[in-house]
C-alpha cells in the first residue's frame, strides 16, 4: 500500500486477513445526496423542488379564463455563512426565487387564444441549506434531520393470525397504501364475506366498490368465477366436465361415460381417477337431476314469451326453477363453479349481503359512509368517489408504490400511472381471494423490501408541497376575483404559508433533532440514524415486538447491534457501514459477484427484494489465490435462512466482515467475542464519550478510526495537494501543486481553524494543526485535528494501564479504582463551555438597561464588570457572581405627600428599578472566554459593543490583509518566473518594487500575454479584497435582527475545566461501565516488578457473567502494543542506528498469519523511519477489524516480540505493604472513556425552595431546585428500624406540613432547635378526594 507523507507519521498495524475489496464509502452521503437531490435543478422533474412545483402548477382559475404557470426557480446566496449564523442565532438559508408566468385567455375567442402573458420572478421564502457536514443551522443551533423508515406505498396482503375472532379462524386482508391519498382495505369476515374499508372507516360489502365502478352482478360473477354448463336433453341432465375440478370430492353418483364406470358412487375421486378421465378425453357426463339443486346461476334467465326474469344472476337453483327454465326453452344453464377446497363462493356470498343493486345506490352508500349526516346528491356522490382513487390531485401511488404494486401482483412492467385503475382494484381482490383459497402467501411487513427510507430531501419536498397546496387555494381565489389586467404574479403569491410549512418542518418536526455533538462519532451516528417513529411512522406505545426485532433482511443494511435501550429499542436503528439507498428509497448492500465459481471484484448492490433469490456466501469464506472456494460445502444465506450449499451454487459473496454492523459497532475491537447486549451498550456509550484535553489514539482499534474522524468533518482536510507554506494555531496555508491548480489562480489554499467553540452538548470544539512548515501534503490528508482526534484518527478516550483484581472493596459492583496519576497527568480532564445570555427587553414601564449602576449591590460584586456593566474576558467567576448588570423598571409605588414633596424639590429618579442581572448559576464556576453583544437596529451601542466591533473589524482586516499578502506572494512568484523566462535579469528585478514589475514590457509576445493576464489577476485580487473587506465591515457594523421587543442581547461564554473525580462515569468499549469510587494515591496502587504502578483497577467479577470477553483480549493486545512501543523507546534512548530500528519495526509489522497489510519500510527515508519511531514509542497502534481480528496465537507472538509473558499475566505487589499478591494478575492496556454523566452536573442539594401547588410537597429534580423523594420503600426502612421521630419529621416538617416548616425555619434562625409537627397537606388532599367520592369524612377533635 502507498502511504502519503502525512500517513507515514503513524501507521496502524492491521491484523485483518480478508482483502479490502471496497473502501468504506463516504459516511454522510445519505444526508448530503438526499438534500442535493432536493435543491438541484432536475430537468426531468422527478424529485426535489422541481417536482413539487410541477405537481401544483399550473394553477387555473375556476372559470378557466386564466392560469398561473411555473417556469423555473433559482436559489440565491445566503446572507451569512454558517459560523455567523451560529453566533447570531439565525437560520442558515437561501432565498428561493421562482419565475412564474400569468397567462390570460380571451373570453369570447375560441379556447386557448391568449390575450396577455406576464412573466415575473417571485420571492417564495427561505429554504434552509445543509452545511458541508450534513447538518442544518436553525435559529443558530445545529440540527440533524433523521431519516425515517416507513412502510413503502404499494399493496400488502396480510392476515390477523387468527387473533380477531374467538374461533381462531385466520382472516385475510389486503391494503393498498398510496404515497398520499386514501387507504383502501379489503378484508374477510368470519363468515367469509369480503368487505372493503376506505380510510379505516366502517366496512361495506366489497362488491359495492365494483358496482360503483359500473359493474353489473353478471359482470362481477364473470370476473371472479369459472363456469360449469349443464345441458337439458330429452329430460336428461348433462354436465360439461373438467376432470381436474373433481379432485378431492366424493362421488354422489356413478361417474360413467361411453358405458364405462370410472368412479363408483360414494368413492373419493383421486388423482388416478382424474388421469383416467383425461386420458379417455371424457368432457361430458350425465348427472342426476338432484345434482343441480343448490348450484348458483351465473347470469339472468328471462322467459322469452313474457319477458319476466325466471331467475336472476347469483340465485340458487331448485328443481322448480329447473322445470320452469326447461319449459321456457333454455336448454343450457351456466352455473358458478365453487367448492370448499380451493374455489370458495366468497364474492357470490358477498353479493347476497350487498344492499345496493346499481351504480347510483353504491355511490350513495359510499358517500354516506365517508360523510355521515350529509344529504347525498348524485353529483356529490360521483365526485367523491372519483376523487378518492382516480384523481391525480388527491391520490398518488408514486413510482415506488406503482413498482411495489405491480411486483406484488406479478405484473411484468414496473412503471405506470400514480392513480388506481379498475383492473388494479379487481386484481387485488382476485389475489386476496386466491390467498384465502390457499394459493399464495401473505407478505411479511417487517421485511426491508416492504419498508423504505425517507431522507431529508424527500421530507422537505413533501413539506414544501404542503405549503404550495395552501398557496394554490389562495391563488385560485385571486385569479377568479379581480381585475387581472393590473395584477402581476407577485400579487398572487403570498410566501408566508410556504415559509411557515418549511420552518415548521425544520424547527419542530419530530425528526428534526438537536444534533448530538458530544464527539465526532456521535455526530456521524446521529446523521446515519434511521427512525421508525415520526409523522407517518409508528408510535412507541403501539409498536409491537415484531417491528422492533432483528429481521434477516437487516443483514448489511441496518445494524443489529446499535439501538437505544429503553422504550425506543428496535425503533431507532443505525445504517450499516456499506449500506446505501437506491432510487426507490430501499436500502441496498454491496456483494461481490461470483462468476463460474470464481469470486470477482465486481460489486453489485442488492436490495432486500432482490437479495432473497440468491445464494450468498459470507465474507470470511476461505478462498485460494485465484478466488476459488477452498471447501466443497459453504455456509450461505438464501431466502433469509443460513444453510450449507455446494460451491457451484454460490452466486454472490459478502464484501467485508464489517458489512453487518454500523459505524459505532465497527469501532469495537474483538466485537465477535462480546455478548450482543453488552456490545449494544458499548456502541451506545462510545457516543457519550467527552473529548479529553489531549486526545490519545486507541492502541487497539479496528481500522475504522481514520474514516470516522475524516468523514465527521471535525478535522481540517486538504482539498488539494501541495506544501505547507505557513502554519499557526488558527490557520494553515498550503501552496498548491502545479498540476492541481485551476488556470489563472494564485494557487494558495487557506484553512482557518475553529478555536475553543461551544458544541451543542457544551463540550469544547478546538482544532490543532498536525502538519509542520514545509511538509508535503496530499489531497485528503488531515491538516488539523479536531476534538477527539489524534493525527487524523478518532480518539474518544485514553489508553490506561488496567489490572483485573479486587482491591479492598473499592471496585465492588462495577466501581472503578483510579490512580492519582491519572488526575495529575490530566488524562481525563475535559473542557466544558457554557453560554449564558442576558436579554434586555422593552417593558411596559420602560426599557431594561444594561449598566454597572445596580441598586443595593456592593463594590465587590461589581469588581469584575467594566463600565458598561459587562464582565471582562478572562475573569474567574463562581456561582452567584454578576456577569451582566441589568436593571428593570419597577411599577410606580404609591408615595406619601412628604415623599412627593421631597421628590419635587430634589428631582430624584422618577421611578424605581430592580436588579435583574445575569448571574452565574449555582454550582458553576469557570473563566469568561468570550463576550458578544447584539444590539437592535436603531438602538445606540454601548461602549463595550463598540469595542467588540472595533476588535472584530481589526481582526477581519488583519485576516484579509494576511490572506491578500499570501495570495500576492504566490502571484508575484509566478510573475517573477514569467519575467525571468522573458529575459529580464533577477538582480535587476529584485531592485525594482514589486508593483513596477507589471509595467515592464517583454519582447516575447506569448510571455507578454501571460504577464498581462497575471496583471489582470492582480487587479481582480485587489478588487476582490476591497469587496470582501467592505462586506465584512457591513456585516459587523450593521444592527442585529432581534426578536420583537428585544433591545440587546449579551452572550457570555464560560469555560470550565473538569478533572476526573469520584462519582464520574467511565466505560470501556465493550459495555463495561462503572463509576469511580476512589482516587487512590500513586504509592498505594499495585505495581509490577519494574515498579510501574497500574492506573486503574477493575473488578474481574464484572467479566464472566456479562460475557464481554473482548475486553480481556483488548487488554492483552494493548499490553503487547505497549511492549513494542517500550522497546522502540529504549532503542531511541540508546540512540541506536536507524537500520536496527527499521528492522525491528518491520518485524513488528510483518507479524501475523497472512495479514492483508504490507508495510515496506525500505521505501521510507531514514527521517521518515525516525519520525514513525517517535510516534510509535508510546505503543504501536493496532487494528483488529470486526469479525476478522487478531487470533490468540498472534496476540501471543506479539507479546513475545515485546518481551512480555505470553499468559498476559504478571506478578503485582501491594503498594501499601510491598507484599506480593498471591497469584498473577491480568495487566494490560484498555481504552477507557469518560462519559458525559459527570457528578458535577448531577450533584445537588436543597435547602428551602419551591413547592408543588396542590400537595405542597417540594418539587423534584435539579432544574427545579427540588428535593429527594422519600418514597414508600424508604418509609418501610425507617419503620423497620423503629426510627419514629426521624420518620415523623420526614413526613411532616421536611415535606408538606406548611405551618410546621415555616415555624421550624423561624426557630432555626432564632437558634432554637425545636420542632412541632402539624398536619401534612397531603392528608387534607386525601380528605378532599374522599369527599369528592360523596363520603363525608371529618376529623373528630379530642
UniProtKB/Swiss-Prot annotation:
Keyword annotations for this protein, in alphabetical order, are: DNA-directed RNA polymerase, Nucleotidyltransferase, Transcription, Transferase
Keyword Transcription in record = yes
Provide the E.C. number(s) assigned to this enzyme. 2.7.7.6
GO CC terms on record?
DNA-directed RNA polymerase complex
The protein's enzyme class = transferase
GO BP annotations listed: DNA-templated transcription
Pfam families cross-referenced by the UniProt entry? RNA_pol_Rpb2_1, RNA_pol_Rpb2_2, RNA_pol_Rpb2_3, RNA_pol_Rpb2_45, RNA_pol_Rpb2_6, RNA_pol_Rpb2_7
Q: List the catalysed reactions.
A: RNA(n) + a ribonucleoside 5'-triphosphate = RNA(n+1) + diphosphate
> To which protein family does this belong?
Belongs to the RNA polymerase beta chain family.
What this protein is called in its record is DNA-directed RNA polymerase subunit beta
Q: What is the organism of origin for this protein?
A: Photorhabdus laumondii subsp. laumondii (strain DSM 15139 / CIP 105565 / TT01) (Photorhabdus luminescens subsp. laumondii)
* Gene that encodes the chain: rpoB
